[in-house]
Structures are given as C-alpha cells and as structure tokens.
C-alpha cells in the first residue's frame, strides 16, 4: 500500500508505516502525477483535493484531511468515485481556544480591560467555537452564540434562547469567528465581514478571525484601519494565503500565520484521528495511542500562591502559550519570500493548557474550565 501524505503532517511516518510505504510531499505542490500509484491520500488545508489532483489516481481508496475544515476537498467528487473520506473534526479545538484566550489576555493588559465586564460573540458554535465560548464563560464573560444552522435545529426543538442572530452578535464587545468557508446558500460565509459590516463597527471593537481568511474582506478592513477610527484586529488567517495583505499587518493588534490550531496535541490529534479511521476502514485494531506520540512538557506542574483572578490567569496561560511570540515572529519575517509557509512548517513546540497540572488550594474550577489539569487540595 502506498500512502501519500503532506510532509508537514506530524507523526505520519510512525503511525502509517505499519500499512505500507509512506511518501511525504509538500502539500501545496502535490500534483496528479504524485498519486498515480497511491492507495491513500492524507492532506492538510493547503492541498486542494479536486478533479485535477485526482485525474490519474485509479487505485485511490481513502482520502483524509487532518483538519477540522473540509472546504479544500471536493467531497462530491469523492462520493461519485466511491472513495471514503475522513476529516478530523475538533482535533485542534483546544489549541484554537488557547490561542483566543491568550490574545484576549494580551489585549486586556494592553488596553486595561476587565474581561468579566465584557461580552464575547462566537460566530460559528461548532467544536471550535463552542470551546472558545466555554473558555470565555470561565473568564466570567457574557457569551453570545451565533450559528444559523444550529439555531434552526434548536428552534425546531423549542430551544429559542440558545442562539442570537448575526446583527445581535455583532453588538458584542468582542466578536470571534469560527466558521467554515462557504460561498453559496443562505448561510454563506464568504466575506461575512464585508465592507458594509466593517463600516458599521464601532471604533475599538475587538474582532478575531481564526477560521478562514476569506470570511473577512481584507481590503475593506485595510481601508477602515487607515481611517481615524480603527478596529482592534486579531488575525490568524488571511485572504490570499500564503501571500497575506502585508499592508494590513501593521494595523492589527495580533497577527499570526494560520497557526492557531498548531499545538503539539492538536496536530498529533488530527493525524491520529486519520490513523484510527484508516484502521477502522481496513478492519484492523489500532496499535498506537495519542499520548505515546507526545513528549513530556517542559513545565508539568505548578502550585499558585494566590486566589484566581485575571492577572493570575494571564500568568498561567502565558506560561504555556504567549501569542505575542508568534506575533513578533510573523511581523519580523513578513517581508521574507515564502515566510508564511516557512513559519508554519517550522513552528516551535507549543503545548495545550491541559499539559500543565495546577495543584493546591487555589486550583479552582475556573482553571479547569479554562483547560488546565486541576488537582485541588
């Protein structure tokens, strides 16, 4: 069996070698000729799986993406060809949640904000959006959930208060986007934040995009940011990746190269979920578990000496992941050719909050809800 994988997919060799020959290739440069003898194709979001890529792949019998989103895959084509398709829903939801939490704490310190007194709207309340919402609620924030497809289902079940509409959500102090990219239909998300919506936003409103770059109109944002009443932007994703609108970067609070979901656990979990799926597809028992893939964290345990407040939460979160390091690296290298993908390929080791065990009398439920492993007493 020949297994073609994105070369940046972690642990692919050790997980899939038991099935046959593993052939790692650059994700953005995969071509049809690479798949002529392939039985399995494993990709990330940078590879478009379409008729052109699959033009000469008669042996292909399994396609998987180690990502939450699937907009880069022509699922209808795979269905017509009877090729099973698997994704990794929720694989990096904790990583993205940690990213948003880290950015909120940076902005709170920078602009002297009390997050408990603020509201946050999550646009897209799926696996990732709900993780962000739960962390925000743990901070004491008022959280609004906007998800039209889920709202319709909830409405049919008589649950009318679980979701708000888009306009209501846009009224929150902070609006965080966690939607797939769709261009058609009543719930299309392409340029969901368009020129008109951008123009109507109050000065200083915090907007976060850790979903897909095309969800925001980047040119319209640049025009707004160059005016007298700019917004506070947190951008992990960009239109035109891997060539973002460089002129927009200086006008952001936090700017990073699509790495919100890049924790060690998140990346390993995505590959491992595909490993499980292939085992199931072939009728084989999984021989490896997720934890065996992960190294011991640098910081394993800590005992706070004070009650939990926003300052302590910031210290603990940034001990594990401080988004400012990624922001500084991105800004320093933005002008270098190919730096966007290079930073993703060689992203430094980063753990999720769950890797830190918080012990002692101040190991509260709040810290557990934020994602830390808590051992009170």
Curated annotation (Swiss-Prot):
<protein>
    <recommendedName>
        <fullName>Erythronate-4-phosphate dehydrogenase</fullName>
        <ecNumber>1.1.1.290</ecNumber>
    </recommendedName>
</protein>
<dbReference type="Pfam" id="PF11890">
    <property type="entry name" value="DUF3410"/>
</dbReference>
<dbReference type="GO" id="GO:0036001">
    <property type="term" value="P:'de novo' pyridoxal 5'-phosphate biosynthetic process"/>
</dbReference>
<feature type="binding site">
    <location>
        <position position="261"/>
    </location>
    <ligand>
        <name>NAD(+)</name>
    </ligand>
</feature>
<keyword id="KW-0560">Oxidoreductase</keyword>
<feature type="binding site">
    <location>
        <position position="262"/>
    </location>
    <ligand>
        <name>substrate</name>
    </ligand>
</feature>
<comment type="function">
    <text>Catalyzes the oxidation of erythronate-4-phosphate to 3-hydroxy-2-oxo-4-phosphonooxybutanoate.</text>
</comment>
<dbReference type="InterPro" id="IPR036291">
    <property type="entry name" value="NAD(P)-bd_dom_sf"/>
</dbReference>
<dbReference type="GO" id="GO:0046983">
    <property type="term" value="F:protein dimerization activity"/>
</dbReference>
<dbReference type="GO" id="GO:0051287">
    <property type="term" value="F:NAD binding"/>
</dbReference>
<dbReference type="GO" id="GO:0033711">
    <property type="term" value="F:4-phosphoerythronate dehydrogenase activity"/>
</dbReference>
<dbReference type="InterPro" id="IPR006139">
    <property type="entry name" value="D-isomer_2_OHA_DH_cat_dom"/>
</dbReference>
<keyword id="KW-0963">Cytoplasm</keyword>
<feature type="binding site">
    <location>
        <position position="147"/>
    </location>
    <ligand>
        <name>NAD(+)</name>
    </ligand>
</feature>
<feature type="active site">
    <location>
        <position position="212"/>
    </location>
</feature>
<dbReference type="Pfam" id="PF02826">
    <property type="entry name" value="2-Hacid_dh_C"/>
</dbReference>
<feature type="binding site">
    <location>
        <position position="45"/>
    </location>
    <ligand>
        <name>substrate</name>
    </ligand>
</feature>
<feature type="active site">
    <location>
        <position position="241"/>
    </location>
</feature>
<feature type="binding site">
    <location>
        <position position="236"/>
    </location>
    <ligand>
        <name>NAD(+)</name>
    </ligand>
</feature>
<dbReference type="GO" id="GO:0005829">
    <property type="term" value="C:cytosol"/>
</dbReference>
<dbReference type="GO" id="GO:0008615">
    <property type="term" value="P:pyridoxine biosynthetic process"/>
</dbReference>
<comment type="subunit">
    <text>Homodimer.</text>
</comment>
<dbReference type="InterPro" id="IPR020921">
    <property type="entry name" value="Erythronate-4-P_DHase"/>
</dbReference>
<feature type="active site" description="Proton donor">
    <location>
        <position position="258"/>
    </location>
</feature>
<dbReference type="InterPro" id="IPR024531">
    <property type="entry name" value="Erythronate-4-P_DHase_dimer"/>
</dbReference>
<dbReference type="Pfam" id="PF00389">
    <property type="entry name" value="2-Hacid_dh"/>
</dbReference>
<keyword id="KW-0520">NAD</keyword>
<comment type="similarity">
    <text>Belongs to the D-isomer specific 2-hydroxyacid dehydrogenase family. PdxB subfamily.</text>
</comment>
<comment type="pathway">
    <text>Cofactor biosynthesis; pyridoxine 5'-phosphate biosynthesis; pyridoxine 5'-phosphate from D-erythrose 4-phosphate: step 2/5.</text>
</comment>
<dbReference type="InterPro" id="IPR038251">
    <property type="entry name" value="PdxB_dimer_sf"/>
</dbReference>
<keyword id="KW-0664">Pyridoxine biosynthesis</keyword>
<dbReference type="InterPro" id="IPR006140">
    <property type="entry name" value="D-isomer_DH_NAD-bd"/>
</dbReference>
<feature type="binding site">
    <location>
        <position position="67"/>
    </location>
    <ligand>
        <name>substrate</name>
    </ligand>
</feature>
<feature type="binding site">
    <location>
        <begin position="210"/>
        <end position="212"/>
    </location>
    <ligand>
        <name>NAD(+)</name>
    </ligand>
</feature>
